[in-house]
Protein backbone atom coordinates (compact mmCIF):
# COMPACT_ATOMS: atom_id res chain seq x y z
CA UNK A 1 0.00 0.00 0.00
CA UNK A 2 1.20 3.49 -0.87
CA UNK A 3 0.34 6.29 1.54
CA UNK A 4 0.22 10.00 0.87
CA UNK A 5 -0.06 12.83 3.40
CA UNK A 6 -1.32 16.11 1.94
CA UNK A 7 -1.58 19.58 3.45
CA UNK A 8 -3.81 22.35 2.15
CA UNK A 9 -6.43 20.00 0.69
CA UNK A 10 -9.48 22.20 1.22
CA UNK A 11 -9.14 24.41 -1.86
CA UNK A 12 -7.17 25.26 -4.97
CA UNK A 13 -4.40 22.92 -6.06
CA UNK A 14 -4.63 20.95 -2.82
CA UNK A 15 -8.28 20.12 -3.39
CA UNK A 16 -7.56 19.04 -6.97
CA UNK A 17 -4.72 16.81 -5.75
CA UNK A 18 -6.94 15.32 -3.07
CA UNK A 19 -9.76 14.47 -5.48
CA UNK A 20 -7.37 12.73 -7.88
CA UNK A 21 -5.46 10.89 -5.16
CA UNK A 22 -8.62 9.63 -3.46
CA UNK A 23 -9.56 7.80 -6.67
CA UNK A 24 -6.20 6.08 -7.19
CA UNK A 25 -5.86 2.33 -6.68
CA UNK A 26 -3.53 0.98 -4.00
CA UNK A 27 -3.23 4.48 -2.56
CA UNK A 28 -4.45 6.00 0.69
CA UNK A 29 -4.49 9.74 1.18
CA UNK A 30 -4.44 11.41 4.59
CA UNK A 31 -5.12 15.13 4.89
CA UNK A 32 -3.76 17.64 7.39
CA UNK A 33 -5.67 20.78 8.36
CA UNK A 34 -7.66 22.82 10.86
CA UNK A 35 -11.03 21.62 9.62
CA UNK A 36 -12.34 19.27 6.97
CA UNK A 37 -15.25 19.19 4.56
CA UNK A 38 -17.75 16.34 4.55
CA UNK A 39 -16.10 15.21 1.32
CA UNK A 40 -12.68 15.02 2.96
CA UNK A 41 -14.07 13.23 6.02
CA UNK A 42 -15.66 10.64 3.74
CA UNK A 43 -12.94 10.13 1.13
CA UNK A 44 -9.70 10.53 3.10
CA UNK A 45 -8.00 7.57 4.73
CA UNK A 46 -7.46 9.77 7.78
CA UNK A 47 -7.94 13.42 8.74
CA UNK A 48 -5.08 14.76 10.83
CA UNK A 49 -6.26 17.79 12.78
CA UNK A 50 -3.53 20.40 12.99
CA UNK A 51 -3.54 24.17 12.59
CA UNK A 52 -0.19 24.86 10.95
CA UNK A 53 -0.02 28.26 12.66
CA UNK A 54 0.48 26.28 15.88
CA UNK A 55 3.61 24.17 15.32
CA UNK A 56 3.83 23.19 18.99
CA UNK A 57 0.54 21.31 18.57
CA UNK A 58 1.95 19.04 15.88
CA UNK A 59 0.35 15.58 16.17
CA UNK A 60 2.42 12.44 16.35
CA UNK A 61 2.19 10.01 13.45
CA UNK A 62 0.09 6.99 14.39
CA UNK A 63 2.10 3.85 13.52
CA UNK A 64 -1.07 1.73 13.35
CA UNK A 65 -2.35 3.78 10.43
CA UNK A 66 0.73 2.97 8.37
CA UNK A 67 1.45 -0.58 9.46
CA UNK A 68 1.26 -2.00 5.91
CA UNK A 69 2.83 0.99 4.16
CA UNK A 70 5.32 0.28 1.39
CA UNK A 71 6.05 3.90 0.57
CA UNK A 72 5.04 7.23 2.07
CA UNK A 73 4.82 10.54 0.23
CA UNK A 74 4.33 13.91 1.86
CA UNK A 75 2.94 16.64 -0.40
CA UNK A 76 3.67 19.99 1.22
CA UNK A 77 1.02 22.13 -0.43
CA UNK A 78 -0.32 24.43 2.31
CA UNK A 79 1.01 27.97 2.21
CA UNK A 80 0.21 31.61 2.75
CA UNK A 81 1.34 34.61 0.70
CA UNK A 82 0.36 37.07 3.44
CA UNK A 83 1.45 39.57 4.58
CA UNK A 84 1.86 41.45 1.30
CA UNK A 85 3.45 44.89 1.55
CA UNK A 86 6.59 46.89 2.09
CA UNK A 87 9.00 45.82 4.81
CA UNK A 88 8.42 48.22 7.68
CA UNK A 89 4.64 48.11 7.29
CA UNK A 90 4.03 44.41 7.89
CA UNK A 91 2.04 42.93 10.77
CA UNK A 92 4.17 41.05 13.30
CA UNK A 93 1.35 38.56 13.77
CA UNK A 94 1.09 37.83 10.04
CA UNK A 95 4.87 37.56 9.74
CA UNK A 96 4.85 34.96 12.48
CA UNK A 97 2.00 33.04 10.83
CA UNK A 98 3.83 33.05 7.49
CA UNK A 99 6.91 31.56 9.15
CA UNK A 100 4.82 28.93 10.93
CA UNK A 101 2.76 27.82 7.93
CA UNK A 102 5.40 28.03 5.20
CA UNK A 103 8.47 26.94 7.15
CA UNK A 104 8.38 25.93 10.82
CA UNK A 105 5.44 23.50 10.79
CA UNK A 106 6.41 21.66 7.58
CA UNK A 107 10.03 21.54 8.77
CA UNK A 108 9.03 19.95 12.07
CA UNK A 109 6.65 17.53 10.36
CA UNK A 110 9.31 16.45 7.87
CA UNK A 111 11.74 15.87 10.71
CA UNK A 112 9.17 13.58 12.32
CA UNK A 113 8.45 11.83 9.01
CA UNK A 114 12.11 11.10 8.34
CA UNK A 115 12.52 9.55 11.79
CA UNK A 116 9.29 7.55 11.42
CA UNK A 117 10.21 6.16 8.01
CA UNK A 118 13.84 5.45 8.88
CA UNK A 119 12.85 3.39 11.93
CA UNK A 120 10.38 1.33 9.88
CA UNK A 121 12.39 1.07 6.66
CA UNK A 122 9.70 2.87 4.67
CA UNK A 123 10.72 4.73 1.53
CA UNK A 124 9.91 8.44 1.85
CA UNK A 125 9.25 10.98 -0.88
CA UNK A 126 8.66 14.66 -0.15
CA UNK A 127 6.97 16.68 -2.88
CA UNK A 128 7.33 20.34 -2.02
CA UNK A 129 4.93 22.65 -3.85
CA UNK A 130 7.33 25.53 -4.17
CA UNK A 131 7.36 28.84 -6.03
CA UNK A 132 9.65 31.09 -7.99
CA UNK A 133 9.48 33.23 -4.85
CA UNK A 134 11.76 30.67 -3.18
CA UNK A 135 14.51 31.51 -5.66
CA UNK A 136 14.38 35.28 -6.22
CA UNK A 137 13.17 38.44 -4.51
CA UNK A 138 9.73 39.83 -5.33
CA UNK A 139 8.85 43.27 -3.97
CA UNK A 140 5.93 43.06 -1.56
CA UNK A 141 6.41 39.36 -0.89
CA UNK A 142 9.21 39.50 1.69
CA UNK A 143 7.62 36.98 4.05
CA UNK A 144 6.59 34.59 1.28
CA UNK A 145 9.98 34.70 -0.43
CA UNK A 146 11.90 34.26 2.82
CA UNK A 147 9.84 31.41 4.23
CA UNK A 148 9.55 29.46 0.96
CA UNK A 149 13.30 29.81 0.45
CA UNK A 150 13.99 28.66 4.01
CA UNK A 151 11.94 25.48 3.68
CA UNK A 152 13.43 24.74 0.27
CA UNK A 153 16.91 24.94 1.80
CA UNK A 154 15.88 22.65 4.65
CA UNK A 155 14.77 20.05 2.11
CA UNK A 156 17.90 20.57 0.03
CA UNK A 157 19.93 19.65 3.11
CA UNK A 158 17.76 16.56 3.57
CA UNK A 159 18.40 15.64 -0.06
CA UNK A 160 22.13 16.05 0.52
CA UNK A 161 21.86 13.88 3.64
CA UNK A 162 20.35 11.06 1.57
CA UNK A 163 22.58 11.55 -1.47
CA UNK A 164 23.24 8.17 -3.07
CA UNK A 165 20.41 6.53 -1.10
CA UNK A 166 16.96 5.47 -2.30
CA UNK A 167 15.46 5.72 1.20
CA UNK A 168 14.34 9.34 0.80
CA UNK A 169 13.73 11.62 -2.16
CA UNK A 170 12.93 15.33 -2.36
CA UNK A 171 11.19 16.98 -5.30
CA UNK A 172 10.52 20.71 -5.61
CA UNK A 173 7.60 21.59 -7.89
CA UNK A 174 6.87 25.11 -9.11
CA UNK A 175 3.25 24.88 -10.31
CA UNK A 176 3.29 28.27 -12.01
CA UNK A 177 0.50 30.82 -11.79
CA UNK A 178 -2.87 29.17 -11.17
CA UNK A 179 -6.47 30.29 -10.88
CA UNK A 180 -6.74 29.94 -7.11
CA UNK A 181 -7.80 31.85 -4.02
CA UNK A 182 -4.19 32.91 -3.46
CA UNK A 183 -4.23 34.72 -6.80
CA UNK A 184 -7.46 36.47 -5.77
CA UNK A 185 -5.71 37.61 -2.59
CA UNK A 186 -2.80 38.98 -4.60
CA UNK A 187 -5.07 40.87 -7.01
CA UNK A 188 -6.99 42.46 -4.12
CA UNK A 189 -4.07 44.45 -2.67
CA UNK A 190 -3.00 47.93 -3.77
CA UNK A 191 -0.06 48.67 -6.03
CA UNK A 192 2.02 50.26 -3.27
CA UNK A 193 1.92 46.97 -1.38
CA UNK A 194 2.68 44.93 -4.50
CA UNK A 195 4.35 46.78 -7.41
CA UNK A 196 3.66 43.94 -9.87
CA UNK A 197 -0.10 44.15 -9.27
CA UNK A 198 -1.02 45.17 -12.83
CA UNK A 199 0.98 42.25 -14.23
CA UNK A 200 -0.89 39.74 -12.07
CA UNK A 201 -4.25 41.29 -12.86
CA UNK A 202 -3.39 40.97 -16.55
CA UNK A 203 -2.69 37.25 -16.11
CA UNK A 204 -6.26 36.84 -14.89
CA UNK A 205 -7.86 39.16 -17.44
CA UNK A 206 -6.05 37.51 -20.35
CA UNK A 207 -6.79 33.93 -19.28
CA UNK A 208 -3.16 33.11 -18.48
CA UNK A 209 -3.86 31.35 -15.17
CA UNK A 210 -3.58 27.56 -15.20
CA UNK A 211 -6.45 25.40 -13.98
CA UNK A 212 -5.58 23.65 -10.68
CA UNK A 213 -7.01 20.36 -11.99
CA UNK A 214 -4.59 20.40 -14.92
CA UNK A 215 -1.62 21.19 -12.68
CA UNK A 216 -2.62 18.46 -10.22
CA UNK A 217 -2.79 15.86 -12.99
CA UNK A 218 0.65 16.90 -14.20
CA UNK A 219 2.17 16.69 -10.70
CA UNK A 220 0.74 13.23 -10.03
CA UNK A 221 1.80 11.94 -13.44
CA UNK A 222 5.37 13.18 -13.05
CA UNK A 223 6.05 12.60 -9.37
CA UNK A 224 3.54 10.22 -7.78
CA UNK A 225 2.19 7.64 -10.24
Q: Each predicted region: which residue ranges?
A:
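C-terminal helical subdomain
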Residues: 168, 172-175, 180, 188-225
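N-terminal Rossmann NAD(P)H-binding glycine-rich loop of SDR-like oxidoreductase domains
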Residues: 10-19
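Active-site loop-to-helix junction immediately N-terminal to the catalytic Tyr of the SDR YXXXK motif
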Residues: 137-145, 157
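Active-site helix of classical SDR
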Residues: 110, 147
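Rossmann-fold cofactor-recognition segment
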Residues: 42-56
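Residue(s) in the substrate-gating loop at a strand-loop-helix junction
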Residues: 131
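Conserved mid-core segment of classical short-chain dehydrogenase/reductases
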Residues: 79-96, 115, 140
Amino acid sequence: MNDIILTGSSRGLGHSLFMLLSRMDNTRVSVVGRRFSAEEEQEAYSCIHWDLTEPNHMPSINPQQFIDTESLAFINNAGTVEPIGEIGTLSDELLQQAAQVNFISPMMFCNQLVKFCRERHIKLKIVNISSGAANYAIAGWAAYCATKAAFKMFLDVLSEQYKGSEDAEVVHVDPGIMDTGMQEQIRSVDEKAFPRLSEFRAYHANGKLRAPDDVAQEILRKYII
